């Protein structure tokens, strides 16, 4: 994170001390890990790459100790796990011949980021991850290094694009989002993350492509192409309109897509299954107050999380109903705009959201839910612009096999298609 951002962030001493206790490896010490992965054939067995295995072993030995310090390389197994679009995931595990000596885990998740926000957002993300871990709302954090981290491996599977729109799953997601929005997190609370991130990304993009380079857009959006200067002007237009929004500012996930919503298996490590007494008490910081007979859902990957207008979280999630990332052929995603939720589906989501937060009278729920629909829709183009610019930059940064160029252009096309909704940002009361 930049020194300017660190100096103005306000941290609770106990939370910050907990994050500080994690060994933060010196800047650049393990930067070679990212360089190595950038040149790696994604279909290659990670165990056949000695340099990768050695670096993973070094990280596990330093952060985990115990058997991880003594296990020979041939008894350390590494396998790549399908993960997010801006990181690479590896499951590291000890062989049965080298069981844990103390309380160290026998398997961990190694996450390496190719996210343009990693350097500027590192302190905030570390605090967020540590806080969620300590409150049993997320995996345990074992270590942080420049460009990645070691975390608890939770046997689970992500929801599919189809599943997040199912009524019973959408109800659970709404309840979890309600609790996320009630969290008090010791980070900067001004809702300026979106525009500041976009400004950083555009600066990076300008440094990697020719200033006159034009990105062709699909014909139906009405804008044939854009360059970096055009995008910078659109950002200022967005900034001016977003600043008028009356949507409440809360702690937001900012990336509630299918891959970041997990359905854990029966044994779920650090994720706490709430008791009936927990539900009755309605603890403000619990992510998962729900019927214990129901399957749990866990929100992960808070790498883009910040204080933000809550309507962005809603709009962004509803857009994800339309984007399927589980596609085996290039560009490895499919956008079906007709799957955007109908008005009654959004109303049902918001009814569950408001009930879970518990501060709205029953006779006011429907009207408040209607208001939330109107609060949310103007942020649809904001989400498209945010991830559109992100996609164009990922072309230059990420080795993950995904059609980032197509994705960026498609999202920008949808931004221009829905741009007129921005005029309603100031009208929500």
UniProtKB/Swiss-Prot annotation:
- Result, substituting residue 303 to N/Q: Moderate decrease in catalytic efficiency
Kindly list the positions annotated as binding Ca(2+).
258, 320, 323
**Residues the record lists as binding substrate:** 84-86
Q: Where does ATP bind?
A: 82-88, 111, 152-158, 257, 301
* GO BP of this protein: CDP-choline pathway; phosphatidylethanolamine biosynthetic process
Notes on activation and inhibition: Inhibited by Ca(2+). Mild inhibition by high levels of Mg(2+)(>10 mM).
Write down the InterPro entries for this protein, in alphabetical order.
Kinase-like_dom_sf
Q: Tell me a GO cellular component.
A: cytoplasm
According to the UniProt record, activity depends on pH as follows: Optimum pH is 10.
Q: Which reaction does it catalyse?
A: choline + ATP = phosphocholine + ADP + H(+); ethanolamine + ATP = phosphoethanolamine + ADP + H(+)
Among its keywords, does the record have Phosphoprotein? Answer: no
The pathway this protein participates in, as annotated, is: Phospholipid metabolism; phosphatidylcholine biosynthesis; phosphocholine from choline: step 1/1; Phospholipid metabolism; phosphatidylethanolamine biosynthesis; phosphatidylethanolamine from ethanolamine: step 1/3
Q: What is its EC number?
A: 2.7.1.32, 2.7.1.82
Entry cofactor note text?
A: Mn(2+) is a poor substitute.
Names of required cofactors: Mg(2+)
GO MF terms here are:
ATP binding; choline kinase activity; ethanolamine kinase activity; metal ion binding
Q: Main role? A: Catalyzes the first step in phosphatidylcholine biosynthesis. May contribute to phosphatidylethanolamine biosynthesis. Phosphorylates choline and ethanolamine but the activity is much higher with choline.
Task: Name the family.
Answer: Belongs to the choline/ethanolamine kinase family.
Subunit structure, interactors included? Homodimer. A small proportion exists as higher oligomers.
| Name this polypeptide is given | Choline kinase A2
Which species is this UniProt entry from?
A: Caenorhabditis elegans
Its taxonomic path starts at: Eukaryota, Metazoa, Ecdysozoa, Nematoda, Chromadorea
What is the name of the gene encoding this protein?
cka-2
């Amino acid at each position: 994170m930049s020194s300017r951002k660190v100096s103005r962030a306000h941290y609770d001493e106990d939370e910050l001390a907990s994050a500080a206790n994690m060994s933060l490896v010196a800047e650049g010490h393990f930067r070679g890990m990212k360089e190595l992965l950038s040149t790696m054939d994604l279909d290659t067995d990670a165990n056949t790459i000695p340099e990768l295995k050695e670096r993973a072993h070094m990280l596990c030995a330093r952060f985990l100790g115990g058997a991880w310090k003594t296990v020979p390389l041939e008894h350390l197994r590494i396998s790549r796990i399908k993960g997010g679009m801006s990181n690479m995931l590896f499951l590291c595990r000890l062989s049965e011949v080298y069981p844990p000596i103390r309380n160290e885990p026998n398997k961990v998740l190694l996450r390496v980021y190719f996210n343009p926000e990693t350097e500027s957002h590192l302190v905030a993300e570390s605090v967020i991850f540590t806080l969620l871990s300590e409150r049993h709302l997320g995996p345990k954090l074992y270590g942080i290094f420049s460009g990645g981290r070691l975390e608890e491996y939770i046997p689970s599977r992500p929801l599919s694009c189809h599943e997040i729109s199912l009524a019973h799953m959408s109800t659970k997601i709404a309840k979890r989002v309600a609790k996320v929005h009630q969290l008090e997190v010791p980070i900067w609370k001004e809702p300026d993350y979106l525009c500041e991130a976009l400004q950083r990304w555009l600066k990076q993009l300008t440094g990697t492509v020719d200033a006159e380079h034009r990105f062709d857009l699909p014909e139906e959006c009405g804008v044939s192409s854009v360059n970096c200067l055009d995008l910078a002007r659109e950002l200022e237009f967005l900034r001016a309109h977003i600043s008028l929004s009356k949507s409440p500012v809360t702690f937001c996930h900012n990336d509630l897509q299918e891959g970041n919503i997990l359905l854990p298996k029966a044994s779920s490590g650090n994720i706490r299954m709430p008791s009936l007494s927990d539900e009755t008490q309605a603890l403000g910081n619990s992510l998962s107050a729900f019927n214990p007979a129901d399957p749990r859902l866990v929100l992960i990957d808070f790498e883009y999380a910040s204080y933000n207008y809550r309507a962005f979280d809603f709009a962004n999630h509803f857009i994800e109903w339309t984007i399927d990332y589980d596609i085996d052929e290039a560009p490895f995603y499919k956008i079906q705009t007709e799957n955007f939720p109908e008005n009654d589906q959004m109303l049902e989501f918001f009814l569950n959201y408001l009930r879970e937060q518990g501060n709205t009278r029953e006779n006011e729920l429907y009207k408040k839910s209607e208001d939330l629909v109107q609060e949310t829709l103007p942020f649809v183009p904001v989400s498209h612009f945010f991830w559109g610019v992100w996609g164009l930059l990922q072309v230059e940064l990420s080795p993950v096999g995904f059609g980032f160029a197509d994705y960026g252009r498609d999202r920008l096309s949808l931004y221009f298609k829905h741009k007129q909704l921005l005029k309603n940002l100031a009208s929500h009361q």
